[in-house]
UniProtKB/Swiss-Prot annotation:
UniProt family annotation: Belongs to the class-I pyridoxal-phosphate-dependent aminotransferase family.
Organism from which the protein derives: Mus musculus
Gene Ontology biological-process annotations: 2-oxoglutarate metabolic process; biosynthetic process; glutamate metabolic process; kynurenine metabolic process; L-lysine catabolic process to acetyl-CoA via saccharopine
Alphabetical list of InterPro entries matching this protein: Aminotransferase_I/II_large (IPR004839), Class-I_PLP-dep_aminotransf (IPR050859), PyrdxlP-dep_Trfase (IPR015424), PyrdxlP-dep_Trfase_major (IPR015421)
Subcellular location: Mitochondrion
Xref: Gene3D superfamilies: Type I PLP-dependent aspartate aminotransferase-like (Major domain)
Binding site for substrate: R20, Y74, N202, R399
Residue positions where N6-(pyridoxal phosphate)lysine is found in the record: K263
The protein's name: Kynurenine/alpha-aminoadipate aminotransferase, mitochondrial
Gene (name only): Aadat
A GO CC term assigned to this protein in UniProt: mitochondrion
Modified residues (N6-succinyllysine): K172, K263, K339, K367
Assembly with partners or alone: Homodimer.
Annotated organelle transit peptide span: 1-29
Keyword annotations of the record: Acetylation, Aminotransferase, Mitochondrion, Phosphoprotein, Pyridoxal phosphate, Transferase, Transit peptide
Amino acid sequence: MNYSRFLTATSLARKPSPIRTTADILSKAPKTLISLAPGSPNPSMFPFKSAAFTVENGSTIRFEDDLIKRALQYSPSYGIPELLSWLKQFQVKLHNPPTVNYPPNQGQMDLCITSGCQDGLCKAFEMLINPGDTILVNEPLFPGTLYAMKPLGCNIINVPSDEHGIIPEGLKKILSQWKPEDSKDPTKKTPKFLYTVPNGNNPTGNSLTGDRKKEIYELARKYDFLIIEDDPYYFLQFSKPWEPTFLSMDVDGRVIRADTFSKTVSSGLRVGFMTGPKTLIQNIVLHTQVSSVHACTLSQLMILQLLHQWGEEGFLAHIDRTIDFYKNQRDSILAAADKWLRGLAEWHVPKAGMFLWIKVKGISDTKQLIEEKAIEREVLLVPGNGFFIDGSAPTSFFRASFSLATPAQMDTAFQRLAQLIKESL
């Protein structure tokens, strides 16, 4: 693929930082190497000398001596080599990307670690979006994505979707305004990429089926656009077998996938990872070299030590326990909704994730209801307008999260909300 046509002028101008290059060399060098290159602080002057973390099974992860010194020091912008290696092997096991053994300049799969997947996504957007570019999304979508894209001056087009995700026929209709060969002409402004959250979409909880993904991928090939597969809730799918990913069917090297440990291990550690064609991942890393420099070394090593202790089987066992918890939480909020909101509102059963997307009947704009009146009744929800491209347009929707509240709290919240809706009709 010709990746240069997707890159912005800023991204094309990026060059490796010589300082960061020496850090990469140092991370792989033998201990006999005498380093006078980097400006790394002397760890003997760091005030922290040890740390210990107790894991849920009662075991302990300890940071002492050389490990604590490493955890508090600069590290490579790509990510810690051992964690990169573990994650690459895990991605191959989970998704078996066709591009694993491609030549580096022809879409070979690569991976880098970011400060949460939002960090990686923002860098991907800035790598790809020029003012006036056409970008495809499916509403409603996470405001963090919208607010990262909008300042870049792109033309954001909504692709119709339902409870099973993006509707391929709707995408075909949008694409029909161009000819496939138009992608070779920058003045035609053909779509540069499709952004989607395929599992447990925030806020709807909808998931894209495998069959639809195949149709969408073929359209991406026909019209030559990239796919950004933002999948933070991949490990929170409530039914097995899990649907195949876009990465698993990427024969061209046109998929950039964003993963995170935020939903399953810790949101505060801020560790995510981006997988995709080497040319594009390298550009994200070049951005990291001169911005955040690298993801937190301590956070990366905490996760690495945990993964080494667990192994793949232990990690997936933790995922199963996590899924059971959130599935029970989902069932609790559905029970509360059915008890109090039946007849007043409607919703689909979330397939994954942490959210229930609710449409109130008879109220065309829930903004005041949710932002003011519900808070007065001590119920905090998110109004739906912020999840749409035109955030000023009225909407009957709002988002309820089932991640933190107890079943009793969910029941009480929806009881209060039901009374409020009745008063507002």
